[in-house]
């Protein structure tokens, strides 16, 4: 007999990078569907303001995902406030565009820049995964044995990295690579792990580009030939949460784009 689809209503979700972009859109959707959201983002973000806009079912938990102490404090705050954590959505990340070697400038990619991207995107994601798994593991399992769901954000750059994306592609490729082994690690305690690899989305990073550039990027998407809407990412997050058999998978959400150099 198939397991019943689980509603997001009543669930508690921690969302990193929750003050803007994909993270904020996810928080809005989940709260709108009756869930509670904890916006985990850096202290100088708009997290406090955005949480207040979303009402009593949302709070801001300031933390840098690279800090064990800060993330643990944020998770403790969430559990003390709401009693448990059912879902974690990892959206926090940064990007740089630096060539490995720039011939005209006679300039090499600095290790500091490479390490910074890896530290936030890859290590930061794993830091949240490992700590939130410890909290979810204390939940009472549902009828299907599930205690929690962890959803990570990679990128199509994990598969078709562009010029200047060595660090970014490495960080997102790492997230893709650790999805299955972590899903297997956490399977015995009933925690699912899924990664979404978005294509070109209308996030703050892209909306600041000139119209000409954005229109060109949108034209590269086969269908629909436009930038993705963050609400579409949030919709997929909800679908992942609600489908109990979806585990250990990386899902491309990209309008069938396959980036060329």
UniProtKB/Swiss-Prot annotation:
What is the superkingdom listed in this entry's lineage?
Answer: Eukaryota
**Pathway involvement of the protein, from the record:** Amino-acid degradation; L-isoleucine degradation; Lipid metabolism; fatty acid beta-oxidation; Steroid metabolism; Lipid metabolism; bile acid biosynthesis
Record-listed N6-acetyllysine modification sites: 53, 69, 99, 105, 212
Q: Which reaction does it catalyse?
A: a (3S)-3-hydroxyacyl-CoA + NAD(+) = a 3-oxoacyl-CoA + NADH + H(+); (2S,3S)-3-hydroxy-2-methylbutanoyl-CoA + NAD(+) = 2-methyl-3-oxobutanoyl-CoA + NADH + H(+); testosterone + NAD(+) = androst-4-ene-3,17-dione + NADH + H(+); 5alpha-androstane-3alpha,17beta-diol + NAD(+) = 17beta-hydroxy-5alpha-androstan-3-one + NADH + H(+)
What are the GO MF terms of this UniProt record? 17-beta-hydroxysteroid dehydrogenase (NAD+) activity; 3-hydroxy-2-methylbutyryl-CoA dehydrogenase activity; 3-hydroxyacyl-CoA dehydrogenase activity; acetoacetyl-CoA reductase activity; amyloid-beta binding; androstan-3-alpha,17-beta-diol dehydrogenase (NAD+) activity; chenodeoxycholate 7-alpha-dehydrogenase (NAD+) activity; cholate 7-alpha-dehydrogenase (NAD+) activity
Name the protein family.
Belongs to the short-chain dehydrogenases/reductases (SDR) family.
Function recorded in the entry = Mitochondrial dehydrogenase involved in pathways of fatty acid, branched-chain amino acid and steroid metabolism. Acts as (S)-3-hydroxyacyl-CoA dehydrogenase in mitochondrial fatty acid beta-oxidation, a major degradation pathway of fatty acids. Catalyzes the third step in the beta-oxidation cycle, namely the reversible conversion of (S)-3-hydroxyacyl-CoA to 3-ketoacyl-CoA. Preferentially accepts straight medium- and short-chain acyl-CoA substrates with highest efficiency for (3S)-hydroxybutanoyl-CoA.
Which InterPro entries has this protein been placed in? NAD(P)-bd_dom_sf (IPR036291), Sc_DH/Rdtase_CS (IPR020904), SDR_fam (IPR002347)
This entry's Enzyme Commission designation comes to 1.1.1.35, 1.1.1.62, 1.1.1.239, 1.1.1.178
Alphabetically, which GO biological process terms does the record hold?
Answer: androgen metabolic process; bile acid biosynthetic process; brexanolone metabolic process; C21-steroid hormone metabolic process; estrogen metabolic process; fatty acid beta-oxidation; fatty acid metabolic process; isoleucine catabolic process
Task: State whether it acts alone or in a complex, and with which partners, per the record.
Answer: Homotetramer. Component of mitochondrial ribonuclease P, a complex composed of TRMT10C/MRPP1, HSD17B10/MRPP2 and PRORP/MRPP3. Interacts with TRMT10C/MRPP1; forming the MRPP1-MRPP2 subcomplex of the mitochondrial ribonuclease P complex.
User: At which positions is substrate bound?
Assistant: 155
Please state where this protein is localized.
Mitochondrion; Mitochondrion matrix, Mitochondrion nucleoid
The protein, known as: 3-hydroxyacyl-CoA dehydrogenase type-2
